Amino acid sequence: PADDDGDYYQIAMLIEHLKAEDINLRVTATRSLPAIADALGPDRVRAELVPFVNDSTDDEDEVLLCMAEQVGKLTAHIGGKQHAHELLVPLEQLASVEESTVREKALDSIQTVARCLSPEQLTDHMVPLLSRLTLKEWFTARMSACCLAPPTYALLLQLLPPTAPAAAAPPEKDAAAGGGVGAAARAEVREMFKKLCTDDTPMVRRCGYGD
């Protein structure tokens, strides 16, 4: 953490600039989220910084682009992997916005966070996130869901593999092979992906075919 008056003053200014009217100040401050998080410490990151970011996802695209990139870098500042899923909340919102560059950065950060999750966090937080995106009315969220389904499924196979010797068992045999939470989560992701691949919106379907 920052340990002298100059550093603390600089961090205090960055925190103030997160709320500034000048977009350039907000962009610079948002780009410094990891430094701010390092100065605040994990408890305040969870109690103050993450909720602030959650409430700040209705901003200009330039700010959101920085936010989508930097939030994924906060995994080292949130107090351990057991809290990493808390970063998915703002990233889920950013994965639904209209601007494609913001969504792409948000998807990268979601996958960065997802790779830090335990099996329980994956089923309790990542799969429900995917479900919410799949069911959203706005098609950009469903496009993001389509992009996230394959890597999420791969993580489920990695962290909660089928117990049968052949991990590449056909999907219809997955439940019998693995049983339990892992098989149920994989089945849920498969159903979501099937739904997205037959979506009414061509752009959503194309995301599915591409993956």
Regions found by a protein language model. Give the residues of each.
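Hydrophobic residues within the alpha-helices of tandem HEAT/HEAT-like
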Residues: L33-D38, M67-I78, L94-A95, S109-L117, ...
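Alpha-helix N-cap/helix-start positions at coil->helix boundaries
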Residues: I23-N24, D43, D61-E62, K81, ...
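A general secondary-structure boundary signal
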Residues: D58-D59, L65-E69, R103, K136-E137, ...
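N-terminal "cap/leader" segments of large eukaryotic alpha-helical scaffolds
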Residues: P1-S32
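HEAT/HEAT-like alpha-solenoid repeats
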Residues: D4-I15, P42-D58, K81-A95, E120-T134, ...
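Long all-alpha helical scaffold domains
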Residues: E104-L107, T112, M143-C146, L155, ...
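Short amphipathic alpha-helical segments enriched in leucine
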Residues: K19, T30-G41, V53-N54, V71-G72
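Alpha-solenoid HEAT/ARM repeat scaffold
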Residues: V27, R31, A47, D61, ...
